[in-house]
């Protein structure tokens, strides 16, 4: 791999995870806020709310994970090298 | 020096050459071991069944209840029984491979190249599982509704047709990438931390990894059930 390609790959890998973490971060914050408000309003529904919250967290997290997959491909299985 | 429990060997595999096909041997080894363990575990638990369950049988009945509830809420009362074995198999296999990859110190066994680990940390395993899910929701839709299944593609309006067709491709893609990325990310984070601070500090991260692995198995099974439920659902 020439040095330009490897430098660009490393920068792109960093950007893929970094930018990809912004949206899900905001979304998880919103979801947690909603869950906390829901629990405060109706403490007996805590179990159900927690289950749904964890499931939706995992969905949001998977968006960042897609970025991570792209980063891993660039770092370990680079198609341009 | 402490033995190295995790290392960063992402692109390296133990290759088996069979004809023209190159197989990733370490994935086969670990998944055979874990499947064997699962089989032994379940046949021990169901060998002497009693009316009021104890020990292993109790645990297995709890699992059965859990999987049945999952399938029933996603697929619906009418056909969930047909799909419960499939959903249960997916859930147990993914769960056992995630936890087996994290809990068993595979690193102590030296391989000529690559390392043993969770079978689901290899993209081929997860893509195979995701394609199985795709095939089964097509089969579920076609066998339950016949050609009327394709009404689903134009259901609210025909404008949705291209998006629904695209969805058939993005479903397996996201299903496989989600599982693969999460499990590989867990292994990588633990690997990096062990590399930086070999003592104590990686332990909370390992627990977090176990937690996310269990959630990912649940999500994989839930989504598979949801796709099947979407395919067999009747529109009015």
Swiss-Prot record, chain A:
Chain segments annotated as transmembrane: 7-27, 57-77
KW Nucleus (keyword) present: no
GO CC list: plasma membrane-derived thylakoid membrane; proton-transporting ATP synthase complex; proton-transporting two-sector ATPase complex, proton-transporting domain
Predominant location: membrane
Keywords of this entry: ATP synthesis, CF(0), Hydrogen ion transport, Ion transport, Lipid-binding, Membrane, Thylakoid, Transmembrane, Transmembrane helix, Transport
Ion transport found in the keyword field: yes
Signal peptide: none
Marked site (Reversibly protonated during proton transport) residue numbers: 61
Cell location: Cellular thylakoid membrane
Mode of membrane association: Multi-pass membrane protein
Complexes and interactors: F-type ATPases have 2 components, F(1) - the catalytic core - and F(0) - the membrane proton channel. F(1) has five subunits: alpha(3), beta(3), gamma(1), delta(1), epsilon(1). F(0) has four main subunits: a(1), b(1), b'(1) and c(10-14). The alpha and beta chains form an alternating ring which encloses part of the gamma chain. F(1) is attached to F(0) by a central stalk formed by the gamma and epsilon chains, while a peripheral stalk is formed by the delta, b and b' chains.
Family from the record: Belongs to the ATPase C chain family.
Function noted in UniProt: F(1)F(0) ATP synthase produces ATP from ADP in the presence of a proton or sodium gradient. F-type ATPases consist of two structural domains, F(1) containing the extramembraneous catalytic core and F(0) containing the membrane proton channel, linked together by a central stalk and a peripheral stalk. During catalysis, ATP synthesis in the catalytic domain of F(1) is coupled via a rotary mechanism of the central stalk subunits to proton translocation.
Protein name from the UniProt record: ATP synthase subunit c
